[in-house]
Design a protein with these regions (language model features):
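Generic structural signal for well-ordered alpha-helices
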Residues: 47-51, 77, 143-144, 220
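ATP-dependent NMP and nucleoside kinases share a basic, alpha-helical "lid"
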Residues: 71-90, 140
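Surface-exposed cleft-lining segments at the edges of enzyme active sites
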Residues: 34-37, 64-69, 121-135, 199-208
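Membrane-proximal basic amphipathic "stem/tether" segments
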Residues: 18-37, 239-263
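PAPS-dependent sulfotransferase catalytic core
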Residues: 1-66, 83, 87, 99-103, ...
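Acidic-and-aromatic substrate-binding clefts and catalytic sites of carbohydrate-active enzymes
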Residues: 39-44, 69-73, 133-134, 162-166
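The conserved 3'-phosphoadenosine-5'-phosphosulfate
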Residues: 5, 86, 94-97, 123, ...
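Short catalytic/ligand-binding loop motif for oxyanion handling, primarily in non-cytosolic enzymes
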Residues: 9-11, 18-19, 69-74, 97-102, ...
Length: 263
């Protein structure tokens, strides 16, 4: 993989502050970092030179893991897919309530936002109801947007639930989809390695959990119907019915349009 964990090229042209210096193990990493610096100085997206970033890897599999690509607009996705018609895309879906709270915990831990009263609904809303948070909080809309452009055989949805339950099997499934060697062992990290394991998480009270669940009630049900898999169990975690009728989902297109609009 690239020496930078999240490139953020298509959303911020890689002009982001990083908490730690990038890896630089060999000549390939050095070439990548030098090319990335030049590329990020350009005024707009340059797909040709972006593709050249991965040339040092030659025939090896390589890619770009950037969670915020889930917020890219249809136009940017279209351009990417037209330039890379055989691009394989993976989306890791997570229960919106859990994802939102985990993200707030991370932001507080890294002092991206000020600590707040986690028991106060108004304080929670002030930190939660931000454009950047909401853009990444609707996995059903993200999947729908990418599916409009990526061929079905080149797009896969995986679930954070599977990462928690059986990380080894999830890793094998992803490697199989990518066409990688399933028997090759990682010489550095195990499948269940979690760099965030030591991070202190904010306490999620029952009151706030219920509040967030009500906010995401429709999205939880939409994910269950549209994404399937472990998402089918998400509504029941919060006491919501898992029975779905066509008319319950009839205005999903309004939700997708709204998410596209704020993107």
């Amino acid at each position: 993989m690239p020496p930078i964990k999240e490139l953020h090229y298509f959303d911020e042209l890689s002009r982001v502050q990083r908490a730690r210096p990038p890896r630089c193990r060999d000549e390939r990493d050095l070439r990548f970092l030098e090319s990335m610096k030049s590329l990020s100085a350009e005024p707009c997206i340059d797909l040709e030179n972006y593709a050249r970033l991965f040339e040092p890897k030659a025939s090896l599999l390589s890619g770009d893991i950037t969670p915020t690509y889930s917020t890219l607009s249809d136009e940017v996705i279209r351009r990417i897919v037209e330039h890379f018609p055989n691009l394989k895309v993976i989306f890791l879906a997570r229960d919106p309530v859990e994802r939102a709270w985990s993200h707030l915990s991370m932001e507080v831990c890294y002092r991206q936002i000020e600590p707040f009263d986690v028991t106060d609904i108004d304080d929670v809303n002030r930190n939660f109801l931000r454009r950047g948070m909401l853009l990444r909080s609707y996995p059903s809309a993200t999947v729908a947007r990418w599916k409009r452009h990526v061929r079905p055989d080149l797009f896969r949805v995986y679930f954070f639930d599977d990462l928690q339950r059986n990380p080894t099997e999830l890793r094998r499934s992803i490697l199989h989809f990518l066409g990688a060697n399933l028997d090759k062992r990682s010489d550095r990290l195990t499948a269940d390695y979690n760099s965030w394991a030591g991070m202190e998480k904010l306490q999620l009270t029952d009151k706030v959990r219920s509040h967030l669940a009500q906010f995401f009630k429709k999205e939880l049900k939409t994910c269950a119907a549209r994404l399937g898999g472990p998402a089918r169990d998400w509504p029941a975690r919060y006491g919501f019915s898992v029975l779905f009728f066509l008319w319950e989902l009839a205005d999903d297109f309004d939700l997708f349009a709204w998410c596209d609009w704020i993107a």
